[in-house]
Amino acid sequence: MDFKQITLSDVGTLRPYLRAQYRSCDYSVLGVFMWADRFGYEYKIEDGVLFMRERSRHGGEYDYLLPLGEGSLCDRVHALRETVGGRLTMSLVPEDALDELRKEFDFTAAEEPDIADYMYKAEDLAYLAGKKYSKKRNLIHQFEKLYPDYTLEAITAENAHRIAECCAHDWSDAGLSELAIYENDHTREVLEDFAAYGCTGYALLTDGEVAAFCIGEVMGDTLIVHIEKGKREYKGAFQMINCLFAKTELEKCGIRYVNREDDVGDEGLRQAKQSYFPEYMLKKFRLEYE
């Protein structure tokens, strides 16, 4: 089987491999399918192992992601090296995979800038306890005071189209970067085919209007938040949806961590993510095999 482009029709095939092997957003269903067009993701499956590659960001033809599926990680990488047949470059390798790989392989590892995932304790985001979260709690209290009749509604295949319409009308692409426009477009696509992805999400409503919404997925002990949108005219909406998402999934699934993805080198995003005091940064590396 040759490598083939990843499309929505492949969700059912790839989903079993993209579950709970790593906490990194890059090895999750939406992490792959939302960004497949952007990074040129391709895949093939052989002997129960999923191989994925992307257009190289470093001048070569392809970089390969960690293979997922049956057998040990090292066995899967041996199989990948046989598949590639020549010099192997891997990207988006989580830091916690390096020690195991070093047992059997010689490679150079370089941290990839601006793509480390922000990892938070789920209880911190759910309850915002302590002095360091006082500003967040104040904004939530303001939202509750201004909109006492707010409701939290689970996103389903039946109501996702209404959220998508809200995106189309209320989240303008004017003045946004190419990357932000791509994210907006693919957020709408996720909503339009919501059931296919098997993800979870919630909309924060005030008087029937969508003030904010979020979409993510639970992988093992971690909630990965892929999408979070809000209207700035609803003061405190971002803080409220962030808190409610973490609290709901903590109570429902017993998660330990929330992964709020990377900051892509954007200073505004970096400050916003740091303001929630991450427990640690999930670093990712590019590997060159000898």
Task: Label each PLM-derived region with a short phrase.
Residues 1-19, 232, 285:
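Short, extreme N-terminal leader segments that mark the start of a protein/domain
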Residues 14, 143, 273:
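A residue-level signal for conserved active-site and pocket-lining positions in enzyme catalytic cores
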Residues 22, 27-97, 205-232:
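Conserved donor-binding loop and adjoining core beta-sheet/short helix segment
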Residues 77-82, 143, 242-250:
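A conserved short alpha-helix in the GNAT/GCN5 acetyltransferase fold that borders
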Residues 97-110, 138, 264-281:
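Conserved active-site alpha-helix within GNAT-family acetyltransferase domains
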Residues 106-176:
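Acyltransferase donor/substrate-recognition loop-hinge adjacent to the catalytic core
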Residues 158-209:
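Short, conserved active-site entrance elements at the starts or edges of catalytic domains
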Residues 200-289:
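Aromatic (often tryptophan-rich) hydrophobic motifs at membrane interfaces
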